[in-house]
């Protein structure tokens, strides 16, 4: 089952449902990507920081070799890590990531965080994480404008078909749009019923920037990381509002949460290593929730953010 697409301001079509690669184990990653392609997934959302791009590429290569899919039918996403924000670092690290994936271009290349950290040589440590070689967080003087100018050159050189941002506020987006020669095609943010960020979503969409939600299931992804507010928060899958809608429509709680996003034009990137759930997560566009039901889910908003760099040792708040 193929996912419907959203037209980006770059002119390219992006699947509304993709497969997220954060925390996908290196040992199983190639097989998971391969199986996801067989199940019908075409968008794969990766990143330098996930540390599994080589294995992702192996799964893609196997599927292409077996004739299951062509490269041009895939939508491969990766991200620029914080340690490579200086203008002359952007293209070299993008080329390394392309080589890791075994592809010639990214369909979408995203600035992962609006934070410039001190450069870490990939030969010394890769992925570099948040700390410098000294073992502590150190900042670079690179500006977002410097970084974005280098990102635009990736489009010029056909290394990336579209470029975007992640974890940006409306203020940062507004500033970026004042000087961008190539407008960001997408904004990827944490988005679930406990963190709806309606004004940010509305602003991005009004500016023609597609929104992608990560962590669509709220605290679930952060339990194994022992993030305190995730551990202390009731699971969305067990919330009465979500459960009752799942029963009404004969869907899973996961499908209800994903449909709440996709019905509002927001792309999603769930993952699963379970074949049944893989298929179920793709089936989130052919049926509709009522307007009042969308609003009921949105009313669960608590402003609860689970992916905050403060928890990774960052001492300057970005949200």
Swiss-Prot record:
One term under GO cellular component: extracellular region
Domain of life: Eukaryota
Reaction catalysed by this enzyme: xylitol + NAD(+) = D-xylose + NADH + H(+); xylitol + NADP(+) = D-xylose + NADPH + H(+)
UniProtKB keywords: Carbohydrate metabolism, NAD, NADP, Oxidoreductase, Xylose metabolism
Disulfide bonds: none
Residues binding substrate: 112
Pfam families: Aldo_ket_red
Site (Lowers pKa of active site Tyr): 79
Pathway connected to this protein: Carbohydrate metabolism; D-xylose degradation
Leading EC class: oxidoreductase
Family matches, as PROSITE patterns: ALDOKETO_REDUCTASE_1 (PS00798), ALDOKETO_REDUCTASE_2 (PS00062), ALDOKETO_REDUCTASE_3 (PS00063)
Any single biological process term in GO: D-xylose catabolic process
Family membership noted in the UniProt record: Belongs to the aldo/keto reductase family.
Protein name per the record: Probable NAD(P)H-dependent D-xylose reductase xyl1
Name of the encoding gene: xyl1
């Amino acid at each position: 089952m193929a996912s419907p697409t959203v037209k980006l301001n770059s002119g390219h079509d992006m699947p509304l449902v993709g497969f997220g690669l954060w925390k996908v184990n290196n040992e199983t990653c190639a097989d998971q990507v391969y199986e996801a392609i067989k199940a019908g997934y075409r968008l794969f959302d990766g990143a330098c920081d996930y540390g599994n791009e080589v294995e992702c590429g192996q799964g893609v290569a196997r599927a292409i070799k077996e004739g299951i899919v062509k490269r041009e039918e895939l939508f491969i996403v990766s991200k620029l890590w914080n340690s490579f924000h200086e203008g002359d670092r952007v293209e070299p690290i993008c080329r390394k990531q392309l080589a890791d994936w075994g592809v010639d271009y990214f369909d979408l290349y995203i600035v992962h965080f609006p934070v410039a950290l001190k450069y870490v040589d990939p030969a010394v440590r890769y992925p570099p994480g948040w700390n410098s070689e000294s073992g502590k967080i150190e900042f670079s003087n690179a500006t977002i404008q410097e970084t974005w100018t280098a990102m635009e050159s990736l489009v010029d050189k056909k290394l990336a078909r579209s470029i975007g941002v992640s974890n940006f506020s409306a203020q940062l987006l507004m500033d970026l749009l004042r000087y961008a020669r190539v407008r960001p095609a997408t904004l990827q943010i944490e988005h679930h019923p406990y963190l709806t960020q309606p004004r940010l979503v509305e602003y991005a969409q009004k500016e023609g920037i597609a929104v992608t939600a990560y962590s669509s299931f709220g605290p679930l992804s952060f339990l194994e990381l022992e993030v305190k507010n995730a551990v202390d928060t009731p699971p969305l899958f067990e919330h009465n509002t979500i459960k009752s809608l799942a029963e009404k429509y004969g869907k899973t709680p996961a499908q209800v949460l994903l449909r709440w996003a996709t019905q509002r034009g927001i792309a999603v990137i769930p993952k699963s290593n379970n074949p049944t759930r893989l298929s179920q997560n793709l089936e989130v566009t052919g049926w509709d929730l009522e307007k009042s039901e969308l609003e009921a889910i949105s009313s669960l908003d608590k402003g609860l953010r689970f992916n905050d760099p403060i928890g990774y040792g960052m001492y300057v708040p970005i949200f």
